[in-house]
């Protein structure tokens, strides 16, 4: 650190130089995040100093968090939506705002483990969870942090988790199952209704990672079942900072009942509240304000239009790609496309180096992974496909 302070002009010149090194979303087709809505940005600024880790000092920010949990509970068909954070909610859905899907997934499995430890089920060995091969890498962190064995079930021909594989991996030490509602690589939705049945039959917890799909699936023309409407679903992760158009970081974790939240409780005797249920201590009240503001501003109608627009982009991409001879691995159910192209690694490299397009690659099979977000336009899609044609004609 410098001895003498710099001027504002020097500081902002320095910051602008750093900002110029960042990638603008203009030609990004690989990210599940996007520009936050302007009202979310303004709300974030208004509550920039609010710390939800000390709720008694920031009652207003705390109330906004409660409202977000309530709105998300309504969206995801929770048993009850009027639940004060940390309050009494014995037969109602509870939750809190997290930094994103990784924290939500960690906390959901931590809750499973704690409830099993204090419950009637006796394990004969290390606890395990069964997840799809398509699950997010955050579950690798779960295994490392908590000493939980992670068993990976294979996928079917449509890149959804295979039910027979799930059932074959369950044993006496299994504490829970994971379902994905919008997997990162293919945008596919696991058969959550079937997972719900298996979870109930085996008395297992079922956590749904809907970090991306949570703000997409409810607004599709033909939504698939994935939320608390299914009786076996015990927790759901959803990220407002993705298709919810809030500021980063803004995630959320909802539980079906208070017992899950209570299993995460630790005493905090020197704060204005007696206990915390969260993973992090200090938490952003600004994120709560941003999420509350954008959800109230857009409403169901606004989010429906947002999803319709992204699905229009998705359809446009598939149509234009077919014109130059490239097919998707499967028909997209969400705004994620896996496109079959020759030598996808080379294509990815060339699209970035020559035209500035940021795309990614699926693992198995290897294909171009493209995410169509609100920052993209129909014109972007036409230009992208023309650039793709120019790159692939040389292979």
Swiss-Prot record:
Domain of life the protein comes from: Archaea
Cofactor: pyridoxal 5'-phosphate
MF terms in GO: aspartate 1-decarboxylase activity; pyridoxal phosphate binding; tyrosine decarboxylase activity
Swiss-Prot/TrEMBL GO biological process terms: carboxylic acid metabolic process; coenzyme A biosynthetic process; methanofuran biosynthetic process
The EC number(s) this enzyme carries: 4.1.1.11, 4.1.1.25
Keyword Transferase part of the UniProt annotation: no
Family per similarity comment: Belongs to the group II decarboxylase family. MfnA subfamily.
Function: Catalyzes the decarboxylation of L-tyrosine to produce tyramine for methanofuran biosynthesis. Can also catalyze the decarboxylation of L-aspartate to produce beta-alanine for coenzyme A (CoA) biosynthesis.
The name this protein goes by in its record: Probable L-tyrosine/L-aspartate decarboxylase
Organism this protein belongs to: Methanosarcina acetivorans (strain ATCC 35395 / DSM 2834 / JCM 12185 / C2A)
